Swiss-Prot record:
Every Ig-like C2-type domain range: 51-136, 142-230
Protein name, entry field: Leukocyte immunoglobulin-like receptor subfamily A member 5
Glycosylation sites noted in the Swiss-Prot or TrEMBL record: N43, N157, N248
Signal peptide: 1-41
InterPro entries: Ig-like_dom_sf (IPR036179), Ig-like_fold (IPR013783), Ig-like_Receptors_ImmuneReg (IPR050412), Ig_sub (IPR003599), Ig_sub2 (IPR003598)
Gene name of the encoded protein: LILRA5
Spans traversing the lipid bilayer: 269-289
Membrane topology note: Single-pass type I membrane protein
Molecular function via GO: inhibitory MHC class I receptor activity
A GO-annotated cellular component: extracellular region
Tissue occurrence: Expressed mostly in tissues of the hematopoietic system, including bone marrow, spleen, lymph node and peripheral leukocytes. Among leukocytes, monocytes and neutrophils express the highest level. Expressed in CD14+ monocytes, but not in T-cells, B-cells or natural killer (NK) cells (at protein level).
Length: 299
């Protein structure tokens, strides 16, 4: 077997002349940079990152962080913002397009912003979108109330006041249920010495069930929240008043018509019963009148 030699050593121009030094340098640079450029141009899709059962976790509860890449992934890394080293490294789970990172007991040290990467033969992927992992239960709960009234008419707006005597830098309003929406506002100091935020919500409708809580947090660790406020449910009144006059007139007319129809049926049934009674009496009298002569003849 012939000994291996660099491909550039076998390149000779037509005519047998030696390759110029400048051309040799360019060829060597092209050969050395070629594979590297191919890897960089691979454009690996970025990883996908999420948390189960969710990204807002009560203090002491467990959470699982999942990172998804491609089937060619050989390694997954979880990186926490502000940390110089990877938070954790995991081998992929079958079928190799996912990895699992577990936190058995959530603390303030786990709260923060995370991203993940995966490694494949083509190189490292792009980072995932950030995941905000929040821990709750580190401060006393704020209060949540509706202004100007806890009962809201359908179609109106309502202002939700989240407040506390504690010096929170911001308040977070969250919606319970399937929607799980959230809003964040900086806190304001009131003349009474309370910190609060006013959240405008609406217009509200009876078709949407409004159940909300709020939290407080401080600026140095924004992902560490207080205990949740008591649940606030907003009753929406005036649903029947939203009917148009034509609808109300139509409904009342229909009800009146049904009532008249029922009375007519009762009268007809009464008349039919009376006729049956009269017929019964007439038949009995006829039968009795025919029997009397027969009885007299028998004597």
């Amino acid at each position: 077997m012939a000994p291996w030699s660099h491909p550039s050593a076998q390149l000779q121009p037509v005519g047998g002349d030696a390759v110029s030094p400048a051309l040799m340098v360019l060829l060597c640079l092209g050969l050395s940079l070629g594979p590297r450029t191919h890897v960089q141009a691979g454009n690996l899709s970025k990883a996908t990152l999420w948390a189960e059962p969710g990204s807002v976790i009560s203090r002491g509860n467990s959470v699982t962080i999942r990172c998804q890449g491609t089937l060619e992934a050989q390694e997954y890394r979880l990186v926490k913002e502000g940390s110089p080293e990877p938070w954790d490294t995991q081998n992929p789970l079958e079928p190799k397009n996912k990895a699992r990172f577990s936190i058995p007991s959530m603390t303030e040290h786990h709260a923060g912003r995370y991203r993940c990467y995966y490694y494949s033969p083509a190189g490292w992927s792009e980072p995932s979108d950030p995941l905000e992992l929040v821990v709750t239960g580190f401060y006393n709960k704020p209060t949540l109330s509706a202004l100007p009234s806890p009962v809201v008419t359908s179609g109106e707006n309502v202002t939700l006041q989240c407040g506390s005597r504690l010096r929170f830098d911001r308040f977070i309003l969250t919606e319970e249920g399937d929607h799980k929406l959230s809003w964040t506002l900086d806190s304001q100091l009131t003349p009474s010495g309370q910190f609060q935020a006013l959240f405008p919500v609406g217009p509200v409708t009876p078709s949407h069930r409004w159940m909300l809580r709020c939290y407080g947090s401080r600026r140095h660790i924004l992902q560490v929240w207080s205990e949740p406020s008591d649940l606030l449910e907003i009753p929406v009144s005036g649903a029947a008043d939203n009917l148009s006059p034509s609808q109300n007139k139509s409904d009342s007319g229909t009800a009146s018509h049904l009532q008249d129809y029922a009375v007519e049926n009762l009268i007809r049934m009464g008349m039919a019963g009376l006729i049956l009674v009269v017929l019964g009496i007439l038949i009995f009298q006829d039968w009795h009148s025919q029997r009397s002569p027969q009885a007299a003849a028998g004597r």
